[in-house]
Amino acid sequence: MNGFAAWLQSTALSRIIVQYPWIWPLCEIIHFIGLTLVIGIAGFFDLRLMGFMRRVPVAAARDLMPLAIGGFLMNLTTGATFFVGKPDQYVNNLAWWAKVFCLVLAGLNAMIFETTIGVRTMALGAGDDTPNAAKIVGAVSLASWLGVLYWGRMLPFIGNAF
């Protein structure tokens, strides 16, 4: 992977990202806004899946998910910008790999939800309790996103990356 990181860091795009002093801070702001959307909305939905806020129909909680997806796309774009700008600081950082693991876990968990219990769970109305499988999916999702947040915040402190 270090060969790939060295190649990526030698590209014109990488040099542009680090050459202009406004790019990195702008991406940090956008990344934070995107993360706020993802954690806030996905966290709300996850808590509903876990059995909290039963007055809210599950489908109504899910209606906000397009905003969370927008936030995720903001994070994907800015995260890729960070990676292209300084790939060596990421590939050698345990916190980055832990963050990637949590992202993959969150994605797999969402796929499991959508392909197994999603349709049945969306039909639950106000006052209905969610099945145990939905509670587990919600807990794994919430833990995954909090892991993404935690490990992302640890990036500067683990491995002296920044």
Describe the function of each predicted region.
Residues 1-162:
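Polytopic transmembrane helical bundles with strong interfacial aromatic enrichment
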